[in-house]
């Protein structure tokens, strides 16, 4: 598998497809480059998936997990493979925001799925420390089981979601993710949201109602900030999952400029 060096960090990269457009995919907190792997073969061109520092198969420095650090990882991978499009999920969307805040013309097309942060710190970041504590205190498999137990009610309503979450946790680097959690939840994606008004690239925003970590209201705020944006808002997690085929097609057409 290809790797990209970014300072003292080695970033794991996986490639799907070939040709244009070249799109870099930035995953969410605790996940890896495999997060969107089931969907990238359906997209045209080249999909460049990578693991952020501390995640998946990339190296895990002792510190340096703020959004500007993650944006640096994103930029290094995008430049290495000539990516002019970017797709980001949650934390990955925050890394895109951080990067275009400094370089508004960095990407030609941008997709943000379930954005989670802007220029206001998370409320009660200590609530995430419990996950970091578990990852640092128990063997990986036991830590994952204990973390999944905290979502017992959610899994009772939709048991299949547990298997999905378990799959997403499998490539996790426990110590690296714990370090990332402690830093990134105390940071902001961008110093001033008004900087996003300078971004002229088309932006596709995908959000859902009822998600406290990825509030739909943030999607509406971003829709107002970006000069050329589309907003898709789903009513629930169930509707989001059911809409995946439609969303994949929507993203495919958007990235191709159709």
What is each stretch, according to the model?
Residues 212-218:
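Conserved alpha/beta-hydrolase "acid-adjacent" motif
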Residues 49-87:
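Active-site loop/oxyanion-hole signature of alpha/beta-hydrolase fold enzymes
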Residues 199, 205-207:
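Short beta-strand/loop motif that positions the catalytic acidic residue
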Residues 97-137:
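Flexible "cap/lid" loop of the alpha/beta hydrolase fold
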Residues 6-59:
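Conserved HGGG/HGGXW glycine-rich cap/lid loop of the alpha/beta-hydrolase fold
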Residues 88-96:
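Gly/Ala-rich beta-loop-alpha elbow adjacent to hydrolase catalytic centers
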Residues 228-258:
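Catalytic active-site module of serine/aspartate enzymes centered on a nucleophile-bearing elbow/loop
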């Amino acid at each position: 598998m290809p790797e990209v060096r970014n300072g003292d960090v080695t970033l794991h990269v996986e490639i799907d497809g070939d040709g244009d457009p070249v799109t870099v995919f930035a995953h969410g907190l605790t996940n890896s480059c495999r997060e969107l792997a089931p969907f990238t073969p359906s997209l045209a061109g080249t999909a460049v998936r990578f693991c952020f520092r501390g995640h998946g198969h990339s190296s895990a420095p002792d510190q340096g997990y703020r959004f500007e650090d993650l944006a640096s990882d994103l930029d290094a991978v995008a430049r290495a493979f000539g990516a002019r499009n970017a797709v980001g999920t949650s934390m990955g969307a925050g890394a895109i925001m951080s990067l275009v805040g400094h370089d508004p013309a960095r990407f030609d097309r941008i997709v943000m799925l379930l954005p989670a942060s802007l220029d206001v710190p998370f409320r009660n970041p200590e609530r995430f420390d419990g996950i970091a504590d578990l990852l640092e205190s128990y063997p990986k498999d036991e830590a994952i089981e204990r973390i999944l137990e905290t979502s017992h009610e959610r899994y009772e309503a939709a048991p299949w979601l547990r298997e999905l979450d378990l799959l997403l946790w499998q490539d996790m680097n426990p110590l690296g993710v714990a370090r990332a959690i402690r830093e990134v939840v105390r940071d902001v994606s961008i110093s001033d949201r008004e900087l996003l008004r300078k971004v002229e690239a088309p932006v596709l925003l995908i959000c859902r109602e009822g998600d406290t970590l990825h509030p739909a209201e943030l999607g509406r705020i971003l829709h107002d900030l970006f000069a050329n944006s589309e907003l898709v808002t789903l009513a629930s997690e169930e509707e989001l999952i059911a809409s995946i085929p439609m969303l994949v097609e929507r993203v495919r057409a958007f990235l191709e400029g159709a």
